[in-house]
């Protein structure tokens, strides 16, 4: 059968919080089968847990943030969550000593490296997939996102930015998910923003950790980062990365096709909630044989460049 996965070892790293600008220590711990994905703030006494759940996403203004009933939050979870989805991790404890996950380089790549460093272990429990059974669509003005049945996990994402530095031919991406494809084609895409917005937000004591080290920064005419883009379609690729992380807030791999136009964290989350609220729209499924799975996860011991 296709089994659940966790980490072999505990791993730790430090980085900067995007919003606070302060040092954050991140620790990833193995967890027992059927634990799920648990985010934990260890700077509070007692520690506060945030199980991955689309209902826990209560703020999507500048990132994806989990907020509990007491108003305690943990922000900027989407890039790490995307790495967990990409590597097929089902069970993990994620500890931070701050109200946010460190931003690292603004992509999911450092988290992929961290997971590979920890090693991946299969567990004696079946991996549970969510299979989309019928179309579900969520709209907000001219923006929309939808799931339709598909025997695999496919992303069809289109953005619309009228900017000289964003090629009009590079604003749509079709991605058929596999671990190898995620690591090589998606994980390195960085978040992006406009200098005028960053300057305003920093004047409001927000995104104090934002810099050229962890984002693609644009003015009205060009990309300001000296090194430019990592690949030509990095903008839409990062939106796909964000969506993979947002959709994995259900804690399970999805079998279906996600289509979106100008979607963001909020719309991604609303679609996921709408799907899960409609019991006729999805079903649980497991696979007795690896070859039967329509979603291609790499072997646990495979090292991916």
Swiss-Prot record:
GO terms for biological process: lipid A biosynthetic process. Pfam families: LpxC. Its EC number is 3.5.1.108. Keywords: Hydrolase, Lipid A biosynthesis, Lipid biosynthesis, Lipid metabolism, Metal-binding, Zinc. The keyword Transcription regulation does not apply. One of its GO terms (molecular function) is UDP-3-O-acyl-N-acetylglucosamine deacetylase activity. Transmembrane segments: none annotated. HAMAP family: LpxC (MF_00388). Catalyzes the hydrolysis of UDP-3-O-myristoyl-N-acetylglucosamine to form UDP-3-O-myristoylglucosamine and acetate, the committed step in lipid A biosynthesis. NCBIfam families: lpxC. This is UDP-3-O-acyl-N-acetylglucosamine deacetylase. It comes from Vibrio vulnificus (strain YJ016). The gene is lpxC.
């Amino acid at each position: 059968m296709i089994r659940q996965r966790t980490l072999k070892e505990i791993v730790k790293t430090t980085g900067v919080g995007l919003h606070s600008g302060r040092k954050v220590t991140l620790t990833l711990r193995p967890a027992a089968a059927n634990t799920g994905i648990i985010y934990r703030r260890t700077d509070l006494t007692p520690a506060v847990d945030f199980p991955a759940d689309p209902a826990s996403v209560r703020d999507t203004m500048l990132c994806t943030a989990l907020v509990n009933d007491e108003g305690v939050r943990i922000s900027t979870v989407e890039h790490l969550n995307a790495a967990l989805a990409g590597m097929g991790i089902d069970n993990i404890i994620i500890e931070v000593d701050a109200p946010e996950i460190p931003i690292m380089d603004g992509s999911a790549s450092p988290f992929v490296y961290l997971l590979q460093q920890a090693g991946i272990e299969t567990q004696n429990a079946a991996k549970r997939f969510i299979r989309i059974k019928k179309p579900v669509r969520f709209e907000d003005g001219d923006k929309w996102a939808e799931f339709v049945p598909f025997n695999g996990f496919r992303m069809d994402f289109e953005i619309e930015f009228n900017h000289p530095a964003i090629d009009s031919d590079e604003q749509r991406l079709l991605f058929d998910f596999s671990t190898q494809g995620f690591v090589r084609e998606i994980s390195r895409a960085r978040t992006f923003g406009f200098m005028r917005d960053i300057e305003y937000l920093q004047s409001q004591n927000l995104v104090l950790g934002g810099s050229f080290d962890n984002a693609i920064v644009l003015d009205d005419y060009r990309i300001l980062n000296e090194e430019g883009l990592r690949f030509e379609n990095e903008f839409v690729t990062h939106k796909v990365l964000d969506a993979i992380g947002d959709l994995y807030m259900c804690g399970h791999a999805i079998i279906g096709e996600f289509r979106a136009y100008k979607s963001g964290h909020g719309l991604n989350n609303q679609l996921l909630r709408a799907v899960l609220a409609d019991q006729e729209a999805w079903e649980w499924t497991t696979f007795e044989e690896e070859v039967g799975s329509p979603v291609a996860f790499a072997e646990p011991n495979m090292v991916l460049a």
